[in-house]
């Protein structure tokens, strides 16, 4: 049954790729690691809001180092460091529930929606979206207006706030590192799938 074998091979490949991605998120070379729950929430919400999982993971790593209970000096809370007033607005706009922001099941969907909102607002410009995530939409809108930044702005050094410069730079760097490592894991999953199917075919007897 060639069709059935082909379909089984595809399902097995997809399963292996997903499994490798989860393992990669959990075990990548870093001083910080997400919990299994956070790793799963990254994948679910990246798919839900059409974000690269590497981008969502990079934002969480830079914002909180995966510390679900983190509270900053300005009152930003949880894995994605959401200010409660902003989180309430996000909940109202997105339809996601508002609750304990130290709960990643509440925090990450809100933060992921907001990240997608900012990417759309700035017409896909990741530098501007990340700058707004860190410094606020009002500041970024002011900079765009006063400094005549173009839609394809990418001069991170021109961002007035050093903290925001650092945030944007780190997120983009970590995202690219994660993407490269994920591609390696994906290739290994495909190779394992081919090897597994070949092994199965060898041991299949034709009656």
Walk through the language-model features, giving the residues of each.
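N-terminal Lys/Arg-rich, disordered targeting/topogenic segments
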Residues: 1-8
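Structural motif marking the loop-to-transmembrane transition
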Residues: 8-10, 126
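Hydrophobic membrane-insertion alpha-helices, especially the h-region
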Residues: 11-27
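Catalytic glycan-binding domains that act on GlcNAc-containing polysaccharides
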Residues: 24-198, 207
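A juxtamembrane structural motif centered on a specific transmembrane helix
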Residues: 203-205
């Amino acid at each position: 049954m060639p069709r059935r074998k082909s379909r089984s091979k595809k399902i097995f490949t997809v399963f292996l790729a997903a499994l490798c991605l989860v393992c990669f998120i959990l075990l990548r070379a870093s001083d910080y690691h997400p919990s299994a729950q956070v790793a799963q929430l990254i994948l679910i919400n990246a798919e839900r809001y059409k974000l690269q999982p590497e981008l969502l993971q990079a934002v969480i790593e830079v914002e909180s180092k995966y510390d679900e209970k983190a509270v900053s000096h300005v009152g930003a809370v949880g894995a994605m460091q959401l200010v409660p007033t902003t989180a309430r607005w996000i909940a109202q706009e997105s339809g996601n529930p508002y609750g304990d922001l130290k709960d990643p099941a509440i925090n990450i969907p809100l933060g992921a929606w907001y990240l997608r909102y900012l990417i759309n607002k700035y017409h896909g410009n990741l530098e501007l979206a990340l700058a707004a995530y860190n410094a606020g939409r009002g500041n970024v809108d002011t900079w765009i207006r006063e400094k005549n930044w173009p839609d394809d702005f990418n001069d991170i050094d021109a961002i007035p706030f050093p903290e925001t410069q650092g945030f944007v730079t780190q997120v983009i760097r970590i995202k690219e590192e994660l993407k490269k490592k994920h591609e390696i894991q994906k290739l290994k999953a495909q190779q394992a799938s081919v090897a597994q199917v070949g092994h199965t075919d060898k041991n299949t007897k034709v009656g």
